[in-house]
A protein has these predicted regions:
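Structured surface interface patches that mediate subunit assembly and partner/cofactor docking
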Residues: 2-19, 24-27, 34-47, 67-84, ...
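Extended, alpha-helix-rich binding/interface surfaces that flank or overlap catalytic cores
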Residues: 54
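Helical hydrophobic small-molecule/effector-binding pocket
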Residues: 98-111
Length: 222
């Protein structure tokens, strides 16, 4: 069985961030592939993005993770695409997942320090950070298009822990402005992606806690 089939985490230990990321990517793939052409203009919890834009952004996130593993500049990857060959988004997302697995095949990458404008951490920590981004934007796309995916508890827990470290409750805007100063040329219009964390009820589902920490209302509807 390969990573593109039903168990993308099979080659990895249970706590390996590569497997966790690929499991989050499998959910993203299913959600992206299930967006009908009549839903592309639908609003999303990302106020400035419609469903088509969020889907394109998600694909670029996977491509950037692969670029990081290869030691390339992740910002060389465009923000998103308007179309993929044959309008086959499942194949495009699956290909990005395979690229991620190949690019991060070397175990040593998990301990290697990677520097981004907003973070410097070992590869394992960077992957966990991207788990949070993938899960949040998959939730955005699913909520916008009437889908109800489920995520493994350990995937959500990994993403939430990384988000709490990388996106503290206090000083978010200041941290973003500091990161913006280090962004490469051509990304000056990069907008602040997270609002203040929202409160959730005691006993809220893990996915609701994660998206609320990112500033999204878990009860959001179009």
């Amino acid at each position: 069985m390969t990573i593109t089939e039903t168990n993308p985490s099979l080659p990895y230990a249970a706590d390996d961030p590569r497997g966790l990321l690929l499991r989050s990517w499998a959910v993203a793939t299913d959600v992206a592939a299930s967006v009908g052409p009549d839903r592309l203009d639908d609003p999303t919890p990302c106020d400035e993005f419609d469903a088509a834009t969020v889907r394109a952004h998600l694909l670029s996130v996977g491509q950037r993770v692969a670029a990081l593993g290869r030691g390339e500049d992740p910002f060389s990857v465009g923000e998103g695409v308007d179309a993929v060959p044959g309008d086959d988004w499942r194949t495009a997302f699956a290909a990005a997942g395979m690229d991620v697995a190949a690019a991060w095949a070397d175990d040593d990458l998990l301990d290697r320090t990677i520097t981004l404008p907003w973070a410097e951490a070992p590869g394992a920590g960077i992957l966990a950070m991207y788990v949070s981004e993938i899960v949040v934007h998959t939730w955005d796309l699913a909520r916008a298009t009437g889908q109800s995916p489920t995520w493994d508890d350990d995937v959500v827990a990994t993403g939430f822990a990384a988000l709490q470290i990388g996106l503290p409750d206090e000083g978010r805007i200041e941290a973003f402005e500091a990161a913006r100063a280090n962004m490469p040329e051509g990304t000056e219009d990069f907008t602040y992606p997270f609002d203040a964390a929202l409160p959730v009820a005691d006993g809220a589902a893990p996915i609701d806690r994660l998206v609320a920490w990112s500033g999204r209302d878990p009860r959001w509807t179009a």
